[in-house]
């Protein structure tokens, strides 16, 4: 009996995560059917999408052969906490009028909220209808939570990105730092990661648009995912899982904002050469 119990297989963390996300999706379907105009439906969808994004980022790291040990995880959490404090301090001490291009995504968020107030079908139909525009509403699926819990100002929209965009972006930045270190065969991995990760994370152009309520850095999650999955991969063997992630990241980066097509075409052309 003890032998049978010891040989019983347990679910991997990946399987548990997939089951949890699937259960969440089923719950959303039930809520959408039973309470189609519930105010909490869109925020719940947004929370689920952010969880899927974070799970996908972890899966990209796993597929790319990047492992985060305790030091890496502790550094990411510490830097994220520092980013929360920095954004709160920087946004609190300034006065900025959100107009013209700076109010564009905030207005899109309000429009998407109004569409979902009519029901799930109307909400998703509205988002899909913008996919051919320069500024799509794809990002609104991820920024509604925790934006829905704030005063819904320009500053609160910028601050909300620290919770729904930055965690997945930091995973990609950390993974890319480690991957490049692997390719360069870095000896002192501790200081290399600490210095390299802090430099890429504090790069001014990474956060400038986010501070102005423009979530352009959302697309960088998928750009860095593409880099992680292809930098040291030469298509010498078939890896369906990797191919699927590359396809999804490419589709997502195009949906996030159309001008990311310049990166997609330029990078894949250079990669092919």
Report the location of each language-model feature.
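Start-transfer (signal-anchor) and selected internal transmembrane alpha helices
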Residues: 1-88
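Helix-to-loop transition at the C-terminal end of transmembrane segments
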Residues: 34-39, 85-104, 211-213
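Perimembrane helix-loop-helix junctions
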Residues: 235, 263-273
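Membrane-interface alpha helices of multi-pass inner-membrane proteins
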Residues: 242-258, 269
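Short acidic/glycine- and proline-prone juxtamembrane loop motifs at membrane-interface regions
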Residues: 205-218
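Short hydrophobic/aromatic helix or loop-helix immediately within or flanking a transmembrane segment
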Residues: 104-112, 120-152, 159-163
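Transmembrane-helix motifs of polytopic, lipid-linked glycan transferases
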Residues: 159-186, 225
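Membrane-interface transmembrane helices that cradle and orient dolichyl/undecaprenyl
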Residues: 11-14, 184-187, 223-243, 253
């Amino acid at each position: 009996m003890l032998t049978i119990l010891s040989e019983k297989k347990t679910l991997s963390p990946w399987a548990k995560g997939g089951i949890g996300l699937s259960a969440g999706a089923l719950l959303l379907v039930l809520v959408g059917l039973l309470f189609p105009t519930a105010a909490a439906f869109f925020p719940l969808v947004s929370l689920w999408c952010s969880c899927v994004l974070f799970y996908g980022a972890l899966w990209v790291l796993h597929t790319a052969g990047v492992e985060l040990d305790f030091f890496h995880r502790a550094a990411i959490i510490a830097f994220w906490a520092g980013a929360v404090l920095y954004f709160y301090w920087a946004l609190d001490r300034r006065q900025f009028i959100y107009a013209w291009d700076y109010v564009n995504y905030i207005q899109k968020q309000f429009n998407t909220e109004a569409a979902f107030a009519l029901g799930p079908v109307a909400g998703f139909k509205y988002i899909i209808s913008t996919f051919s525009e320069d500024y799509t509403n794809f990002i609104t699926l991820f920024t509604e939570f925790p934006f829905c819990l704030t005063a819904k100002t320009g500053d609160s929209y910028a601050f909300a990105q620290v919770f729904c965009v930055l965690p997945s972006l930091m995973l990609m930045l950390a993974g890319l730092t480690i991957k490049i270190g692997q390719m360069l065969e870095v000896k002192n991995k501790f200081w290399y990661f600490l210095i390299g990760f802090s430099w890429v994370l504090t790069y001014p152009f990474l956060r400038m648009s986010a501070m102005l309520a423009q979530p352009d850095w959302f697309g960088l999650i998928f750009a860095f995912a593409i880099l992680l999955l292809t930098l040291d991969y030469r298509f010498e063997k078939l890896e369906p899982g990797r191919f699927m992630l590359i396809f999804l990241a490419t589709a997502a980066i195009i949906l996030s904002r159309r001008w990311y097509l310049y990166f997609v075409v330029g990078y894949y052309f250079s990669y092919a050469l």
